[in-house]
Structures are given as structure tokens and as C-alpha cells.
Amino acid sequence: MSKFWSPFVKNLVPYVPGEQPKLTKLVKLNTNENPYGPSPRALAAMQAELNDNLRLYPDPNSDLLKQAVASYYGVQGNQVFLGNGSDEVLAHIFHGLLQQEKPLLFPDISYSFYPVYCGLYGIEHEAVPLDEQFQIRVADYARPNGGIIFPNPNAPTGCLLALDAVEQILKASPDSVVVVDEAYIDFGGQTAISLVDRYPNLLVTQTLSKSRSLAGLRVGLAVGHPDLIEALERVKNSFNSYPLDRLAIVGAAAAFEDREYFAKTCQQVIDSREWVVAQLQAKGFEVLPSAANFIFARHPRHDAAGLAAKLREQGVIVRHFKQQRIAQFLRISIGTQEQNQALIDGLGEL
């Protein structure tokens, strides 16, 4: 802490990202990256963009990518917002739409960036407890609020809220913005983007870091009513008019166009997830139902922190949270078959 820091900065509690180890020999199953590489079409598009044009600023509106997203989801271009990763998109949403008089609602076990944004932007909030099965209770959100946000599937649990339940939340709060954070939706869920034309208070966010294997590019998006998108554009252009670089724009657009590769790799992750679940259950683990590219598991006879340490000694990194209610769980990303086997072998006999 420095004497030059403002009182505001001194009171911030920043987000702690997952470990990015420098050792390349480790089996990295802690940050939910896709084990399969980006679309070859995306790589080719970025390679073609490595030319003299890099001396020029990128399109501030990222229209090429915006139209690719709009075409993919069957919406209009003015219903799409783009940012430098979904975290930046979420930051603009908190800043531009969720600073209200009434408290923002989100699950008590959820994406840990939400309370960080609330602290950054001075947003009053309430953490709504999940039920004993770590599911969202829809009725708990049917009360006065200044907005609602939740991941679907939830993170770090991986549990999915059905689309009709999402719609119940929307109907119960027609005067509040409801944000559905769909970072992992492509691994087993149905996107709420199909509802945006019926609910002007709905905003759906997604990322290209997970199902499209572009975590290194930092591309995120939101889809919603044009009025909501306009608010985000106003915030963006008061902060950074050029959030996406030229390589990110063309690479992400090509990734959306390569539907065959996308479908194939998503299915590979889903199939691998079911294999890992079966292997862990055979070792006595309790595994929550997952619609994501990770699983959330605990062993009734073994401490989670101890298991994480044991795996690390075997060269396998998983994520352990010390948060109340989930301190005995491990979040395990789905890797390649070789990585998944290393996980199971690393656990040994329990």
C-alpha cells in the first residue's frame, strides 16, 4: 500500500484469477480453458491479417464480428455489444445498467467477479443462497431489486437453470435488467438469446474463451434490446473506443463462421466430461450435475485442499475454493483424454 493511493483504491478487494503456471509440463485443469485449439479458419484469418494494416487502428465498432454474431444468433447488429473479454463486457454492464437504488441480486455461490464489480462501482447487492443441491431457487428472486445477474450454467458449480426457469425470473422482474452470464452455455445448455426479442430487460453475455478456444484473444459479447446495447456503447466510448484489435475481430468472426469445428469440439468436451464424471464417481466422489466444461466434485472422506495438494505433487493443477459451503469441493476443468487420465491416475487409490 502506498501513500499515493486514493482511499477508494485502498478499499478495493480485487478479483484473484486462476493460476497460470510457468512450468509447461503441468497438466492444467484449473482455469476452464478448452483443451482443443481454435478453429483452423480462425487461425488462418488471423494469419492473413498479419500485414501492413496493423499500423492502422481497428474498427471501433468491430462491425465484421458484430455481423457474424448477429447472423449466428438471428438478431440485428444493434442488439450486439462486443468487448475485450466478457469480463470487460460485464464491467460495462455493472457500470452502465446495474447502479440502481435497490440492491443487485446474484447467487451466493457464483462468479466471484460480481462482488468485485459491486465494490468498484459502489453497487449495493445481496447474495441469494442456492438451495441444498446448489440450484437457483427462482422464487427467491421475485422481490424488489435493482437488477439480477447469474451465470448459466453456474460457476463454479456447473449446474444449469432451465430456460423456462430463466423466463420465470424475467417475468417476475419486468422493470429490472436481468443478466444471464452464459460463459459455459455451449457445453449442455440452451441459450437465453432466443428470449431477447420478447423481454426488453434481458441481457445475455457470452465469451469466446471457452467453447471457441480463444481465451488468448480476449473477446466477449452481449446480446439484448437495442436500448440496453446503446447504454453499453455509451460506457465503452467513454472508456476505450477500440477494445478489440484487428486480429481479434477477424479471428473471432471466423470462429463463428466455422460451425462444424465448433460443434465437433464441444461434443468432444461433453463426451470427455461424462467419462471423467464416471471415473470420479467410481472413486467415491460426489459430482454435481454439470452442463459446463468443468465438474465440481467432493469426496466424503478426503479433504479437498489435501486432494488438490496431492494432485499438484503429481503435476496436475485443479481449482480449490476456500469459500463457505464449497470449501470441500474441487473444480476440475475437462482436458484432453491424456490430461483426464493424468487426473485419474494422480488421485490414485482413495
Swiss-Prot record:
Annotated EC: 2.6.1.9
InterPro entries in the cross-refs: Aminotrans_II_pyridoxalP_BS, Aminotransferase_I/II_large, HisP_aminotrans, HistidinolP_aminotransfase, PyrdxlP-dep_Trfase, PyrdxlP-dep_Trfase_major, PyrdxlP-dep_Trfase_small
GO molecular-function term, one example from the UniProt record: histidinol-phosphate transaminase activity
The protein's annotated pathway: Amino-acid biosynthesis; L-histidine biosynthesis; L-histidine from 5-phospho-alpha-D-ribose 1-diphosphate: step 7/9
Enzyme class of the recorded protein, top EC level: transferase
Catalytic reactions of this protein: L-histidinol phosphate + 2-oxoglutarate = 3-(imidazol-4-yl)-2-oxopropyl phosphate + L-glutamate
Pfam families, alphabetized: Aminotran_1_2 (PF00155)
Domain of life: Bacteria
Requisite cofactors: pyridoxal 5'-phosphate
Modification type N6-(pyridoxal phosphate)lysine: residues: K210
Coiled-coil spans in chain: none
Example of a GO biological process term: L-histidine biosynthetic process
Protein keywords: Amino-acid biosynthesis, Aminotransferase, Histidine biosynthesis, Pyridoxal phosphate, Transferase
Record carries keyword rRNA processing: no
PANTHER family, alphabetized: HISTIDINOL-PHOSPHATE AMINOTRANSFERASE, HISTIDINOL-PHOSPHATE AMINOTRANSFERASE 2
Quaternary structure, from the entry: Homodimer.
Family: Belongs to the class-II pyridoxal-phosphate-dependent aminotransferase family. Histidinol-phosphate aminotransferase subfamily.
Entry protein name: Histidinol-phosphate aminotransferase 1
